[in-house]
Amino acid sequence: AESEDPGKTLLTDAVNDATSTLSNSAANAIDKTIPNSRTDISITSIDNRKTRYNIRNVTGFAMSSDGLARNFMQTSLNNANSRTVLNIGFGRRFLSSDEKWMTGINAFFDYDADYGHQRASIGGELKSSAIGLTANSYQALTEWKSGKDSNQEHVLDGYDIELGAQIPYMPGTTLFLKSWKWSG
């Protein structure tokens, strides 16, 4: 096997380090500007000109008077496979009075900025320190459209459900079971 060009490897490493530093600085600046905010920014594949990025922000709003419920907003902007997708969602999470269980509900809207596809979803979650269950239902809001390479495409309806459980005596190890179905 051929070895990589050391100059190219050095340049790639420098670009990746600079990108990571700038991404972290931008995320920190956003979080300092927006109270109760957590932002993640990821940029990859710059060297092969198929750049992918993901910007996600979760902002928590005021707690309920008893401190056991909180509303949140999640926004994201993703670019992969020559598609840019915007996502916005709102939810509410509830903590049990004994603080052992968290439940939540959410609603999201997805928009493909390149081709105009739209989808809405609703979901729920139930989590403890040892087990978690999430379920989401997705509904297409747009019909068939001309998409990438002029192919006809459309958003699918569907659902997903995931169960995760911590494996006893193996801290930090969780086993997940996931099922999904898409139709349309």
Regions found by a protein language model. Give the residues of each.
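Outer-membrane beta-barrel signature, preferentially recognizing the C-terminal barrel domain
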Residues: 152-159
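Transmembrane beta-barrel domains of bacterial outer-membrane proteins
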Residues: 1-122, 126-130, 137-150, 166-184
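S-adenosyl-L-methionine
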Residues: 162-164
